[in-house]
């Protein structure tokens, strides 16, 4: 009797033109992440540019970028409908039991990026080859006094403090926002520190009413947004999932979206981003299943969307795409999007 892995190797590549990834037990989150990374040409090219040297990078079976290279090659040129990720997870140092445990996909992404950059730096490729450069933006976190300066009731400038905050992902609230644009605007609304929660200003040696927030200074070539679907309920002391509807636009104009930010950085033009992929979680905070919805990355399929569901890859119907973007008001659009 053939298991899923064995049967996948006997079949031909799917009609979608893409190769799926076999689930080791609970690695759907890893599979979804890998498919979104593979279908990002800029990242794929940097992975392919890596040159393995055993004297520098150690054993081949423990070299993460080499194993990712080989996996990407099978995804791009393989003739079977699905391929395995076991060589890559072995390079991670995972045991068999770790393949049966679902992990945080955002945390895994950050750890993978750091590991890839570490190997690339060992190669002497320079900063231009860093994976994180594709995703790194910069915010300025601030605390600003709400108390007017002496003699000037109109200008609250008694205190203002900024410090840089580089990021690889922007984490956005989804509860009650309705869509990603509103989530971005809410993320950059400053918090007011007053009453019992006043800010102690060391420069002024007293507590003051203040605002604490963040402004965008620069955005990366590839913008990765994290919708904060998981929260902690302090009454039940349990992790819970926020299932509020959050519509996702195909194109988001960051200049228009951030124009309403209270302390938007004047003169910065951020441009627009086209949605390339979504990692979708269905289920509860206790467990569930990840899939990736990906826009075709080739000239012959750029207008099409594909559902990467572990070993199975299929083209999405117009109705499925409409539901994903929030065009069907009767459907609970994107409530599960991670």
Task: Tell me what each language-model feature is.
Residues 21-36, 100-111, 287-290:
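Active-site nucleophilic cysteine motif
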Residues 2-5, 39, 43-166, 200-205:
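Papain-like cysteine protease catalytic cores
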Residues 17-22, 95-97:
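Short, conserved non-catalytic motifs in the polymerase core
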């Amino acid at each position: 009797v053939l298991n899923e892995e064995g049967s996948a190797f006997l079949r031909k590549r799917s009609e979608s033109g893409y190769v799926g990834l076999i689930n080791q037990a609970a690695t759907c989150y890893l599979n979804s992440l890998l498919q979104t990374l593979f279908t990002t040409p800029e990242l794929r090219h940097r992975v392919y540019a890596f040159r393995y040297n055993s004297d520098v990078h150690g054993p081949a079976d423990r070299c993460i970028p080499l194993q990712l290279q080989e996996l990407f090659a099978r995804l791009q040129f393989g003739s079977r409908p699905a391929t395995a990720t076991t060589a890559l997870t072995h390079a991670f140092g995972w045991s068999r039991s770790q393949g049966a445990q679902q992990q945080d996909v955002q945390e895994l992404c950050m750890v993978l990026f750091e590991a890839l950059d570490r190997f690339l730096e060992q190669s002497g490729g320079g900063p231009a080859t860093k994976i994180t450069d594709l995703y790194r933006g910069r915010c300025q976190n601030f605390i600003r006094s709400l108390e007017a300066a002496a003699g000037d009731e109109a200008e609250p400038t008694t205190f203002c403090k900024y410090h840089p905050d580089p990021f690889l992902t922007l984490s956005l609230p989804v509860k009650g926002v309705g869509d990603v644009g509103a989530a971005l605007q809410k993320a950059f609304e400053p918090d007011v520190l007053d009453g019992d929660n006043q800010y102690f200003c060391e420069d002024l040696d007293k507590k003051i009413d203040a605002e604490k927030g963040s402004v965008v200074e620069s955005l990366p070539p590839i913008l990765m947004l994290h919708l904060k679907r998981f929260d902690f309920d302090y009454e039940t002391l349990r992790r819970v999932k926020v299932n509020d509807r959050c519509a996702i636009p195909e194109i988001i104009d960051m200049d228009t979206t951030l124009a309403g930010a209270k302390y938007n950085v004047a003169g910065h033009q951020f441009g627009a981003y086209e949605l390339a992929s979504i990692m979708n979680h269905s289920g509860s905070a206790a467990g569930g299943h990840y899939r990736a919805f990906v826009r075709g990355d080739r000239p012959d399929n750029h207008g099409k969307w594909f559902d990467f569901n572990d070993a199975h890859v299929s083209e999405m119907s117009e109705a499925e795409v409409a539901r994903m973007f929030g065009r069907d008001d009767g459907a609970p659009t994107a409530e599960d999007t991670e």
